[in-house]
Amino acid sequence: MRTTSFFLLTILCLALTASAQIYSEGPIDGNNNAFFVTGPAFPNFLGSVQDISNGFVAANSGSPGGLEWGEWSVGAPTSFSYELGSAAFGNDIGSATVGQNAFNSVFLFTNGFGYGVYDVAVPISSSVMTAGSTYWLSISNATDAANDGTQGWDIPNGGSGGPAICNVRQSGTNFGACIEDGVILGGESFTISNSIPPYTPEPSSILLFGSGILGLAGILRRKLNIQV
């Protein structure tokens, strides 16, 4: 009876963990590519003013309590803005500017391009999301103490992106799909959950730290990306 009860308890705990995740675009890559997200408040170091919005279909219903995303930055990041909306770059569901520190923006490793890769996990507030409905998450106005314009949103899956739709905005104008070398890229690294950080990292995120360190030994293919 004890064995059976323990088994049932384990299943229930797993179910609760899964239901807490409203949507996940995949674990942080950190080694291949990222999109600048310093705009519209700040230019990146190449002089353009760019931010990114990802359209996704909610896997579960719930009130978002936490946002986790992968950030590239030469200096330790100090703040960013998020917007949640029913359309690209919209904020009708929720938005805020978030201060960053060593607790909510955990340094993972320095990649082969010289960027620090950070696991950012912060509490958020928005209206209830419904499973099967489409929403948009935008990351904007990312910066660090030096305001060096190096902040980017990590692109997972070897730099090809996940299943979400990626839109790019330049100087306040949405140019639509995120394209590199004629290839349309998918969404960036992020997870939206019911949980309020800090929460236990997923096993894939823990494994990533080790794989990222090993990745420094190879020659990486891409660097921080700007749409032109």
Region spans (language model):
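Extended extracellular/luminal ectodomain segments enriched in beta-structured repeat modules
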Residues: A58-G66, P77
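Aromatic- and Gly/Pro-enriched, solvent-exposed loop/edge beta-strand patches characteristic
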Residues: S73-A164, V168-Q170
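Short beta-strands within extracellular/lumenal beta-sheet-rich domains
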Residues: L46-V57, V120
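C-terminal membrane-anchoring or membrane-association module
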Residues: A217-V228
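Boundary/junction segments of secreted and surface-exposed precursor proteins
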Residues: S19-P40
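Short, threonine-centered small-residue motifs that mark membrane-proximal processing/anchoring sites
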Residues: M1-S24, F190-S211
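Extracellular beta-rich ligand/substrate-recognition surface
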Residues: V37-Q50, T110-Y115
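PGST-rich, cysteine-poor low-complexity/disordered linker and tail segments that act as flexible spacers
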Residues: Y23, N33, I52-N54, G75-A76, ...
